[in-house]
């Protein structure tokens, strides 16, 4: 039989079809997925690519404009210029060199935004340094760049509402693409009617009927695919509607799997015959409450404690879900509350919740999340409420779990409330250090300090009732840490009633208890330093000074821990400020000298790390030092410290330099001030002072000339008031004190410098010259005469100071200075000669023989000469 009749028709007999084997076309062994069939490759032109790049950058610039991010806008504008340069060939070819309208629109909008921001002077002053610099640079670059598009920009400003060219083209192209993508609906072919095969004699009729109905389908299949299997024609075909339903079900199933993996589905009930969709809620996925106990179990305190032990046993393990553990503990506490199992059990469960909250943060060095910290405060506050409400309830770490009493009073629960409080306070400090100190977030976090202080007060009540003296000392020290750096204006009032308790009285009570009952030196040391700091903050100079001298902390503080050393540095800095406010300049300089001469007061006060010293420490050391930093609201103004130090050094150093001008052995009192003064004197041209340090140096040079008015104007002016003096308590008194001290020290400098010119000086003239009371001038001159700083005598009837000529003139002083230097040179040469021996000797004698015999004689001559010179100096 020919192969063209292999497929045959229904009209042929079965015997003829069985004689020849049917040759079938091989079926393909691969299939195409629906995604591959639906995906179409899109070919874009160069114009579309370049324009899409420009539109993306313009979109980012608009986002930067919304948030007023000038730095990012500048970077995006520079990127836009580069992108337009790359698109220039396309613009030249497609647009005849005319810039597209959407690009011109972006330039105009950016220019209007920059001009508006530049004209708002107040808002521009409030910008950060980086944003202000970026705004200036962006304005200059934009003005320069838009000069090439002046014609297009002017045309755009005439009719800005006209739509962009690319938008019209996009809309037209999208319409065309939609028209092209509309499928041509074909007329559906009628499906063959299928019915079950008839019995016996009806079989031949049925086969004839089927063949007549399927001739057209066979012919179409043969044309498309060649040969086909006859059996496939009788299989039930899937209609288009059923196929669409299958695709929809498949898409829904895939979407469900994706949502389940991302955790966005709230709940889905699955049954044998299918499931139902539920509403998706915002936020994290929620789950059913964990089942604690069986339905029929009798819940009592022992069962709850057993369940608590099972939950706590997983604490600290590697794969423990901390969030799930917290949920279990909360559910367990709810169950105990529903069954009314007692407040002691509630206290134990809350203690476990607090411990779990502390464990939730895996890294101890990182700050806790604010929401979890708030939960900590709430739970600890509830614990304190329970303890204050039940006097027969004790929470202590000395109680063993076997000895706990949770059902019958007196209740005994294992735990340590004071440890929880200390951890809570430390986490609060970490939260403050993590925030930007110049943001509103820091202010919001700082408001929680009131909650922490109130909680510490309540914990102190519990500890005073049930705790040991050492625990009371720990609680009081936490209260002191939140109290010592705060200024209380009531404490400086003189009309305050004696019954009202100020912070000074509170500090006195807390510190005295620690002095008497502390068993460790650390708590006592920190209490003393905090007490000194608080006294100095309220200008109690003598109390603070006496407490420091009696404690001898300056001798042992170098052996303390770093946090105590930081507190010592802060205390000395504040003590120096207190001494300066009280007019004790020498004491202020002594307190601040060791801190400021190191050149790194910022690090010593734990107020930040210097970037230029990063190579001196490793990453671990830097991490540790950052953990020791103080919160921003506890910082001491470094510029204020430096100004006080420089002014104190000026008031001490300038009169001393005038008194010992020709002394070769003169020592420097303040090395830092001396270096700044020498650097200023070496400059050929000295401009007007700008910084605080330049003001102090200019004032020192004016005082050295005796011009006290210029000196006072350099120290006290509007700029210095805003930067320094207005930051002090009692700024007006400080400025008045500065004026008095500058006049007095200028008078002393004048007398030291020009005393050799006068035979006598009128005290009344000096008082008028320096605008000081005559009694004060008389006191200063008398003190200088008594201290042998000024060789003179006072004539009371004439109110004059008679100067004596016993001191050498300038020429004599220079000659004496030269003689001292020559004598030192001779001594040094003789020592070198003695050390080298007779190696410089010429002659026939052996090396070293003659000089070795002469050495004792030479040493005796040198000693005699030195003794004679010392005697002459003593006689002078």
UniProtKB/Swiss-Prot annotation:
GO CC list: eukaryotic 43S preinitiation complex; eukaryotic 48S preinitiation complex; eukaryotic translation initiation factor 3 complex
One Gene Ontology MF term: translation initiation factor binding
Ordered alphabetically, the record's keywords are: Cytoplasm, Initiation factor, Protein biosynthesis
Q: Which Pfam families match?
A: eIF-3c_N, PCI
Q: Where is the composition biased (Low complexity)?
A: 206-219
Give the compositionally biased regions (Basic and acidic residues).
154-172, 182-192, 848-861
Its recorded name reads Eukaryotic translation initiation factor 3 subunit C
Origin organism is Bombyx mori
């Amino acid at each position: 039989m020919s192969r063209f009749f292999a497929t045959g028709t229904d009209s042929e007999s079965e015997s003829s079809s069985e004689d020849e084997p049917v040759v079938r076309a091989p079926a393909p062994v691969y299939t195409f997925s629906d995604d591959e069939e639906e995906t179409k490759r899109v070919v874009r032109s160069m114009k579309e690519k370049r324009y899409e790049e420009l539109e993306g950058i313009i979109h980012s610039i608009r986002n930067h404009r919304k948030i007023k991010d000038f730095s990012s806008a500048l970077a995006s504008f520079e990127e836009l210029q580069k992108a337009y340069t790359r698109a220039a060939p396309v613009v030249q070819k497609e647009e005849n060199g005319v810039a597209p309208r959407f690009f011109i629109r972006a330039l105009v909008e950016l220019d209007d935004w920059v001009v508006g921001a530049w004209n708002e002077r107040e808002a521009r002053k409030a910008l950060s340094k980086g944003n202000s610099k970026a705004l200036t640079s962006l304005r200059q670059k934009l003005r320069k760049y838009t000069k090439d598009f002046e014609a297009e920009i002017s045309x755009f400003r005439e009719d800005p509402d006209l739509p962009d060219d690319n938008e019209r083209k996009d809309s037209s192209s999208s319409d065309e693409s939609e028209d092209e993508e509309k499928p041509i609906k074909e007329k559906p072919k009628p499906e063959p009617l299928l019915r079950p095969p008839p019995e016996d004699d009806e079989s031949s009729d049925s086969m004839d009927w089927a063949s007549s109905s399927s001739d057209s389908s066979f012919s179409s299949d043969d044309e498309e695919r060649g040969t086909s299997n006859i059996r496939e024609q009788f299989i039930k075909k899937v209609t288009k509607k059923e196929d669409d339903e299958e695709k929809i079900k498949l898409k829904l199933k895939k979407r469900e799997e994706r949502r389940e993996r991302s955790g966005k589905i709230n709940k889905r009930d699955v049954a044998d015959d299918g499931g139902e969709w539920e509403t998706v809620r915002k936020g994290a996925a929620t789950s059913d409450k964990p089942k604690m106990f069986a339905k029929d179990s009798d819940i009592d305190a022992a069962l709850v404690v057993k369940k608590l032990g099972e939950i706590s046993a997983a604490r600290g393990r590697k794969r423990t879900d901390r969030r799930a553990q917290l949920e279990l503990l909360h559910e367990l506490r709810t169950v105990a509350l529903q069954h009314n199992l007692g407040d002691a059990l509630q206290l134990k469960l809350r203690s476990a919740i607090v411990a779990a909250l502390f464990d939730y943060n895996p890294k101890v060095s990182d700050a806790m999340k604010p929401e979890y910290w708030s939960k900590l405060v709430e739970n600890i506050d509830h614990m304190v409420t329970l303890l204050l409400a039940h006097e027969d309830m004790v929470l202590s770490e000395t109680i063993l779990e076997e000895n706990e009493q949770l059902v019958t009073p007196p209740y005994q629960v294992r735990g340590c409330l004071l440890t929880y409080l200390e951890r809570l306070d430390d986490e609060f400090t970490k939260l403050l250090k993590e925030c930007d100190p110049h943001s509103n977030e820091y202010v919001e976090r700082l408001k929680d300090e009131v909650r922490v202080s109130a909680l510490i007060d309540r914990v102190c009540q519990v500890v005073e009732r049930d705790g040991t003296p050492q625990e009371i000392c720990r609680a009081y020290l936490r209260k002191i840490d939140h109290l010592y750096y705060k200024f209380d204006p009531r404490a400086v009032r003189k009309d305050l009633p004696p019954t009202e308790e100020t912070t000074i009285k509170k500090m006195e009570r807390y510190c005295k208890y620690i002095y008497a009952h502390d068993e460790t030196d650390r708590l006592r040391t920190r209490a003393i330093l905090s007490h000194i700091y608080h006294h100095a903050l309220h200008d109690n100079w003598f109390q603070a000074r006496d407490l420091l001298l009696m404690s001898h902390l300056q001798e042992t503080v170098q052996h303390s821990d770093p946090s105590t050393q930081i507190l010592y540095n802060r205390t000395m800095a504040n003590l120096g400020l207190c001494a300066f406010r009280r007019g004790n300049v020498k004491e202020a300089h002594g307190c601040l000298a060791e801190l400021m001469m190191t050149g790194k007061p910022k690090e010593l006060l734990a107020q930040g790390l210097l970037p230029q010293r990063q190579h001196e420490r490793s990453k671990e050391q830097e991490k540790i030092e950052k953990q020791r930093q103080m919160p921003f609201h506890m910082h001491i103004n470094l510029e204020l410290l430096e100004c006080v130090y420089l002014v104190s050094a000026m008031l001490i150093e300038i009169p001393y330099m005038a008194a010992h001008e020709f002394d070769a052995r003169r020592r420097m009192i303040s090395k830092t001030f001396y270096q700044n003064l020498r650097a200023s004197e070496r400059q050929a041209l000295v401009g007007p002072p700008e910084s605080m340090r330049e003001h102090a140096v200019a004032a020192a040079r004016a005082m050295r000339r005796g011009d006290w008015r210029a000196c006072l104007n350099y120290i006290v002016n509007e700029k210095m008031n805003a930067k320094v003096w207005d930051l002090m308590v009692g700024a007006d008194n400080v400025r008045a004190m500065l004026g008095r001290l500058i006049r007095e020290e200028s008078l002393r400098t004048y007398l030291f410098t020009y005393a050799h010119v006068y035979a006598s000086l009128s005290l009344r003239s000096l008082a008028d010259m320096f605008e000081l009371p005559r009694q004060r001038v008389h006191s200063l001159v008398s003190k200088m005469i008594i201290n042998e700083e000024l060789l003179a005598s006072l004539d009371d009837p004439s109110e004059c100071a008679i100067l004596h000529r016993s001191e050498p003139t300038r020429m004599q002083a220079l000659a004496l200075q030269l003689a001292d230097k020559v004598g030192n040179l001779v001594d040094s040469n003789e020592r070198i000669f003695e050390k080298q021996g007779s190696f410089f000797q010429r002659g026939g004698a052996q090396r070293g023989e003659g000089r070795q015999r002469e050495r004792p004689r030479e040493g005796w001559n040198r000693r005699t000469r030195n003794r004679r010179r010392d005697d002459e100096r003593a006689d002078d």
